[in-house]
């Protein structure tokens, strides 16, 4: 195995850990690293739908993983299999992204407005028209894949379009933390502070990830104050409102609520249909009405999954040269779309938990008491109690003959862990959504 392949295998391992097995197998397993030249990584994708989906859903995951493995920043450039001559066009598009580190696809024009996101959209547009004066800070919160990143990026793109001289910075809180730690390690704090305290617009995605990181919170607090005092626009996104973010300081939580707080809810069916038609139009695909309704009626809570279902369907029909139809949609999306009539059983919950943590069902049914197995067993018991009407004795019996007291203890332990560790809450939420088909 040559050096490039070794690097790529390590990167794939990181991506697998971040996105989960099903997403990895579908979207990342088929792509490969062709070459690395002059800080540019050339990635081969089967067709443009893969490129579009990765850029829309995980725009920085490959470059971030490169940095984690090699310590070097790279610019990712996509090459479509068999179409090397299109590389220049793709590279040209990628150059636009460099400005403010913004994805040019995320604009107000491409954002579908509905009752579930109307307020957040209106607030974002107002901020974009009058940065630093309308609502400062603007705090947008909502579940995973509902359009928070799209909106805060649209703010940046709009401002740069109208006022290209402005210094717009988009960054995730994880990236902010990583650069902060690196600056301390390499004694480059003055450069770090100059980079983030001199911007005109500060767009921060997924702020909840600084929870529990005291030094990062301290640095972010002073960065926030410096920008706010100069009337520079601050926009923050999170998966929950400020008051529900645990393990952050009260003074930081207070800063988050100083301006306007806007939420995004899961889209209703009309908005989901509009999103599908908009995405299909952007991809140059004719989407039959029955297929659109089929997808929209099944994928209910997540715009990212909604668009992902369409992109998977488009990728399949593009590769196989067959037209989009209801039969094709049902076949291609059979694993992604839930069966609404499927009852929630303890076996279904055990399977979902084990898939999420990488164990076998027989492990959590066994007498084994390793920490990994014990934690998974407690999670499964907790979710079973939450989603079913089974008695405590019935739940215990399904986990290797445990008694009702063990189930009660397990549920209490999970509740405590949820309060201390937000990653546990996110894991439980994702498992519940998978089991319930949301």
Swiss-Prot record:
A molecular function (GO) term: lipid binding
Region annotation (Domain III, AAA+ region) ranges: 101-317
Transmembrane segments: none
UniProt function note: Plays an essential role in the initiation and regulation of chromosomal replication. ATP-DnaA binds to the origin of replication (oriC) to initiate formation of the DNA replication initiation complex once per cell cycle. Binds the DnaA box (a 9 base pair repeat at the origin) and separates the double-stranded (ds)DNA. Forms a right-handed helical filament on oriC DNA; dsDNA binds to the exterior of the filament while single-stranded (ss)DNA is stabiized in the filament's interior.
Record PANTHER family: CHROMOSOMAL REPLICATION INITIATOR PROTEIN DNAA
Name of protein: Chromosomal replication initiator protein DnaA
Phylogenetic lineage: Bacteria, Pseudomonadati, Nitrospirota, Thermodesulfovibrionia, Thermodesulfovibrionales
Residues that, per the record, bind ATP: 145, 147-149
């Amino acid at each position: 195995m040559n050096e490039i392949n070794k690097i790529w295998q390590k990167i794939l391992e990181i991506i697998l850990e971040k996105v989960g097995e099903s997403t990895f197998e579908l979207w990342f397993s088929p792509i490969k690293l062709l070459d690395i030249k002059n800080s540019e990584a050339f990635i081969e994708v089967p067709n443009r739908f893969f490129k579009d989906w990765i850029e829309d859903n995980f725009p920085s995951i490959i470059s971030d993983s490169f940095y984690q493995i090699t310590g070097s920043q790279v610019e990712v450039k996509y090459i479509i299999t068999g179409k090397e001559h299109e590389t220049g066009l793709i590279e040209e598009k990628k150059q636009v992204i460099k400005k403010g580190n913004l994805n040019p696809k995320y604009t107000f024009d491409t954002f579908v407005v509905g009752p579930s996101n109307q307020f957040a959209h209106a607030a974002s547009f107002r901020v974009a028209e009058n940065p630093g004066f309308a609502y400062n800070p603007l705090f947008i919160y909502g579940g995973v894949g509902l359009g928070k990143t799209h909106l805060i990026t649209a703010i940046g793109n709009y401002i740069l379009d109208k006022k290209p001289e402005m210094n717009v910075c988009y960054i995730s809180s994880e990236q902010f933390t990583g650069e902060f730690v690196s600056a301390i390690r390499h004694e480059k704090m003055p450069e770090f502070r100059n980079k983030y305290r001199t911007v005109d617009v500060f767009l921060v995605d997924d702020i909840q990830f600084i929870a529990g990181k005291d030094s990062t919170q301290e640095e972010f607090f002073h960065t926030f104050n410096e920008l706010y005092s100069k009337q520079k626009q601050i926009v923050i996104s999170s998966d929950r409102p400020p008051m529900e973010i645990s393990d952050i300081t009260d003074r930081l939580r207070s800063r988050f609520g100083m301006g306007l707080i806007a939420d995004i809810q899961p889209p209703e069916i009309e908005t989901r249909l509009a999103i599908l038609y908009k995405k299909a139009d952007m991809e140059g695909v004719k989407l039959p009405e029955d297929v659109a309704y089929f997808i929209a009626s099944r994928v209910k809570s997540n715009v990212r999954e909604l668009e992902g279902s369409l992109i998977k369907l488009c990728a399949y029909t593009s590769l196989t040269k067959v037209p989009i139809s209801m039969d094709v949609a049902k076949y291609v999306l059979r694993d992604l779309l839930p069966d609404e009539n499927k009852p929630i059983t303890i076996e279904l919950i055990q399977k979902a938990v084990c898939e999420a943590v990488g164990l076998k069902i027989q492990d959590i049914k066994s007498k084994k008491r390793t920490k990994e197995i014990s934690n998974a067993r407690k999670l499964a018991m907790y979710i079973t109690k939450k989603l079913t009407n089974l008695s405590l004795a019935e739940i215990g019996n399904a986990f290797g003959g445990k008694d009702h007291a063990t189930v009660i203890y397990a549920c209490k332990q999970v509740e405590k862990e949820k309060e201390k560790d937000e990653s546990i809450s996110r894991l439980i939420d994702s498992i519940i959504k998978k089991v319930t088909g949301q």
